[in-house]
């Protein structure tokens, strides 16, 4: 008989590779606050990969920064973001993504009047690898 895993087990499964696969969502993932009233949920968090769902209210922005080791991929679920990477600005709409190589100075902002939801996929995880820029 197959093992039935409850969604409540998702937080533990998001942090280990030995746990069986379980559904994970914002409802059962580890949550944190960042920037201008923004939210993040760790959907996957291990030593090799992180997948975070993030929420940015209208007008919010993060601090320009870079990661020495982590490459990142931002995939927009709803709304659109303005991504600045090495001084170049790109509007990224829902259903699209943008790759940020390691070492690239970048900043994501929500210039619209609508909230934005997006995924940030980092390999390796970017925690502890962030260097904020003087702006």
Language-model region placement:
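Ligand-binding loop in jelly-roll beta-barrel domains
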Residues: 102-128
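Glycine- and acidic-residue-biased ligand/ion/polar-headgroup-sensing regions
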Residues: 69-71, 75-81, 86
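Short strand-connecting beta-turns/loops that link adjacent beta-strands
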Residues: 47-49, 69, 113-114
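A short, N-terminal "cap"/entry segment at the start of jelly-roll beta-barrel domains
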Residues: 1-49, 63, 129-135
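Short acidic-glycine-tyrosine-enriched beta hairpin
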Residues: 87-102
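Structural motif
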Residues: 80-82, 89, 105, 115
């Amino acid at each position: 008989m197959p093992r039935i895993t409850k969604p409540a087990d998702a937080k533990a499964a998001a942090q280990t590779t030995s746990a069986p696969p379980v559904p994970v969502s914002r409802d059962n993932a580890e949550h944190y606050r960042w920037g201008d009233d923004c939210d993040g949920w760790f959907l996957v968090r291990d030593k090799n990969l992180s997948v975070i769902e993030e929420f940015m209210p209208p007008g919010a922005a993060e601090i320009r920064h870079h990661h020495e080791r982590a490459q990142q991929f931002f995939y927009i679920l709803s709304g659109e973001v303005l991504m600045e990477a090495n001084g170049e600005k790109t509007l990224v709409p829902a259903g699209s993504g943008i790759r940020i190589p390691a070492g690239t100075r970048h900043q994501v902002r929500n210039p619209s009047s609508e909230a934005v939801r997006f995924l940030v996929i980092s390999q390796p995880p970017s925690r502890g690898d962030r260097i904020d820029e003087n702006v």
